[in-house]
Amino acid sequence: MFVAALSRPGASVSGAFPWSWCWTWKARNVFLALRERGLLHRQKPCERGSGNASSAHAGMTHGRIGKRVSTKTPTILYTATDEAPALATYSLLPIVETFTKAAGVAVEARDISLSGRILASFPEFLSDAQRVPDALSELGALAKTPGANIIKLPNVSASMPQLIAAIKELQAQGYKLPDYPADAKAPEEKGIKTRYDKIKGSAVNPVLREGNSDRRAPLSVKQYARKHPHSMGAWSKTSKTRISHMDEGDFYGSEKSVTMDAAGFVRIEHIAADGTVTVLKEKTPLLAGEVIDASVMSYRALAAFYAAQIEEARKNKVLVSLHLKATMMKVSDPIMFGCAVEVYYKDLFAKYAALFAELGVDVRNGFGDVEAKIAKLPPEQKAAIEADIKAVYKSQPELAMVNSDKGITNLHVPSDIIIDASMPAAIRTSGQMYGWDGKLYDTNAMIPDRCYAGVYQETVRFCRENGAFDPTTMGSCPNVGLMAQSAEEYGSHDKTFQVPSDGKVRVVDQDGKLVFEHAVEKGDIWRMCQAKDAPIRDWVKLAVTRARATGWPAVFWLDPKRPHDVALIKKAETYLKDHDTSGLTILFKSPEEAARYTLERLKKGENAISVTGNVLRDYLTDLFPILELGTSAKMLSIVPLMNGGGLFETGAGGSAPKHVQQFVEEGYLRWDSLGEFLALAASLEHLAGVTGNKRAKLLADTLDQANARFLESDKSPKRKVGEIDNRGSHFYLALYWADALAQQNDDPELKARFAKLAKVLGDNEAKIVAELAAAQGKPVDIGGYYRPDPAKTEKAMRPSATLNAALLAL
């Protein structure tokens, strides 16, 4: 979602070059460079939709796909994504390319944005000029090769409302995409629905993550947090905030696990009460040593749990809130979310059941779907329903709010409250969430499944007993996470089903032998997960490596009462024998015990490495960084790919839609690109190690120096108009990086080149800052949300003519 103005390649760098908008300084230079390399040919003008407006992502820097990535020039692939990080890339990428070009390193972009993935999935509906390559598939294949060097920015993991909104936006821009067929019946409709469904949820990360996760706060970031502590809400010993979870009928209580003795495959079947057999998934290949497990969530027990906790919140006079991850867990969690909507608004749904069915209300899309559907009714009928909605709010406990001013509740949109962001934010804010009046209140936070709810409960209990953490003294908790090859729950989407009728769900192997079986009722959610042996071995190795490098305790967060974790404990204990662990502290604790152990160490200013599965990797790399650093976006997130390449993720946070909202309304982008700075330094260092490119190593070292100075000088974006924002932070990175290169003596040529840039930027600092500040304080039109207009967005994100000219002059 940034303008790098190169060809939009097809199978052989075919397609239209967007001459109409992108002949900027950067476009010209990079275009000429690619043409010299024989990668680009002049073609017809680009069209956006059926009109002549430019395509928002059409100008992405695309190099060769697969074998087409240059073999002569070391290449870093930089992902074009969504929302705030994508806006930031319009400003940052020209700076990055200015520096890396000097080292003979190519930085090429790949469009894996939500809109880009939609367009790539439906080429037959688009004109030749509108078609885009399947960049995600390209990167997925590349991630399995030793030469992979990918910088991955946060992207939208689309909920159904987000997917529908993106489709409508693209259609309005002239892309003749098919509507999403919610009630697909014909084979063609089913095919379209299947393609769209593959785009939902976390469709990107499982493809790219061909390695396990190493996430930690760099020393410079930790020192910055201690010198410039973020706000932390005070905790009261009388706080009524609690984490509530089910005691039976959940995934945790029904889990069964098996480790495969040999390679083979399994089939998932539903057996109805009358004996009818329906194949849910015909064939799932499995490897020797692979851990598979299956579990079921009772819909009836889930609804009873919600009802009990809503009543508990009413009695205790606290907010009620629901914390799931409907984006990542795109099959199970929207169903669980919809169940909460039906229970909370039970009187409304009972009264209008027939009407809501006629309107096509889908509770999996949240209560916002009700409001959207009734908006089309006659005024009197709509007013009557709205009166009944108000009556629900009077009789039920108050819902936590996403946006009090706009009346957006916790139950409005599934993607608005994501557990790994919402729970740390509440814990940081005295354990409280916002009510209807915009004030903070204690909450009953519902996390239905027991697998990981206890981690948050321990954290709440610890803060209530010991008070809030002090960022100036608290320790650090880096993470080693098992995630390669779609490990565990985050790879379960294609093996998750809502049960069509009472009966059984069973798993049988290729010989017809029973592997698992669960008794089920209609509406229950059944799922199967996998964790392959090679990633588990690599995970254990990475844990030992990090423990040895730091000298800190490494704690495996595994529950001896959970069948899946028992299998992992057995494997981890076996594979630890393959490594020298002398002098290391390596522990195995249940998630609750591990949380307590870690929290106690952090309070004392000590450190502990969390070694976790895929879900806790996700949760903890938000929880602890938000408490330590104020944000998870400042984490160094490295994925050593199992075949030798490197994936460098920018922080651990999301794509910050509220930042985009503020930018559009006020011309101020508060996105912090420090995660990108850190990832780029690590990427350059990896590239230098693989290729022997000394200039890449010099760029990495000087970027590290620039990052440290950037933090020490406190040039990160603030929050309000009139203060430094994302664009200003990029200017200071460029200034400090150029200055570091000008000060070094290892490469006289680079020293001389960047001394000129450093002088120009330094001499014009006040002018550049003024030009950037002048762009703030007024609404910005970027021509779209999921696929904004590149010319408008580039203009908004690069408003300093002086800075642009200085970069061009280099």
What are these regions (language model features)?
Residues 788-810:
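C-terminal accessory extensions/subdomains outside the catalytic/core fold
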Residues 10, 15, 38, 49-51, ...:
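Residue-identity detector for glycine
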Residues 3, 30, 42, 47, ...:
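Short hydrophobic alpha-helical segments enriched in small aliphatic residues
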Residues 70-338, 347-570, 575, 579-597, ...:
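Extended, well-ordered protein cores
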Residues 751-759:
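Short, charged, amphipathic alpha-helical segments
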Residues 19-25:
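Tryptophan (W) side chains
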